[in-house]
C-alpha cells in the first residue's frame, strides 16, 4: 500500500504538467487525412503530396507538420499526418497557392478522402518528437 501511495504521489506532478500542456496546445489542429488514389495516377499523386507538404512546412509558420505516408500493404492508400498551430493557421494553409495547386491537380486522382480530426493524448511529447530532428515551429 505504501508503494502504491508513493507511486500516486509521484504521478501527480506529471499529470498536472500534462494538463497544463494540454491547455497550451488545445488550439492545435491535428488531423489524419485518409486518401485512396487511383492506381494509374499514383506516381503523379505522390509528387503532388511531397511538394505540398514540403512547401507548406517550409513557408507557413503555422504548419507544424504535413507528413504523407503510404501503406505498405496497399500503395494506393495514403495517410497524411497534419498538425497546425491553430484553426487560423489551417484556414490560411488551405488558401495558399501551393495547396490550391495540389487540390486542383489531384481532383481527378483521388478516389476517396476522409479528414479525421484527432485528439492529442500526450501533447507534452510533441516537442520531444519534433525536436528529435528539427525545432518545433509554433
Place the predicted regions along the sequence by residue.
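Bacterial Sec-dependent N-terminal signal peptides
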Residues: 1-22
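Hydrophobic alpha-helical segments, especially transmembrane helices
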Residues: 3-4, 32, 94, 104
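Glycine-rich beta-strand-turn "strand-cap" elements at beta-sheet edges
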Residues: 19-30, 67-74, 103-138
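Short, glycine- and small/hydrophobic-rich beta-strand elements in well-ordered beta-sheets
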Residues: 20, 54-79
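An amphipathic, aromatic/His-enriched active-site/gating alpha helix that lines ligand/cofactor pockets
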Residues: 24, 55-65, 83-118
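N-terminal targeting signals for Sec/Tat export/insertion, comprising classic cleavable signal peptides
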Residues: 27-58
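Short hydrophobic/aromatic beta-strand micro-patches
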Residues: 36, 81-83
Amino acid at each position: 500500500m505504501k508503494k502504491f501511495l508513493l507511486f500516486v504521489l509521484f504521478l501527480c506532478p506529471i499529470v498536472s504538467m500534462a494538463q497544463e500542456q494540454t491547455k497550451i496546445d488545445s488550439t492545435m489542429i491535428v488531423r489524419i487525412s485518409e486518401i485512396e488514389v487511383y492506381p494509374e495516377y499514383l506516381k503523379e499523386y505522390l509528387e503532388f503530396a511531397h511538394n505540398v507538404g514540403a512547401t507548406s512546412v517550409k513557408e507557413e509558420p503555422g504548419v507544424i507538420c504535413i507528413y504523407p505516408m503510404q501503406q505498405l500493404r496497399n500503395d494506393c492508400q495514403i495517410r497524411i499526418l497534419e498538425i497546425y498551430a491553430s484553426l487560423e493557421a489551417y484556414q490560411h494553409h488551405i488558401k495558399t497557392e501551393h495547396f490550391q495547386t495540389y487540390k486542383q491537380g489531384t481532383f481527378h486522382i483521388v478516389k476517396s478522402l476522409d479528414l479525421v480530426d484527432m485528439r492529442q493524448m500526450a501533447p507534452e511529447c510533441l516537442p520531444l518528437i519534433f525536436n528529435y530532428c528539427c525545432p518545433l515551429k509554433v
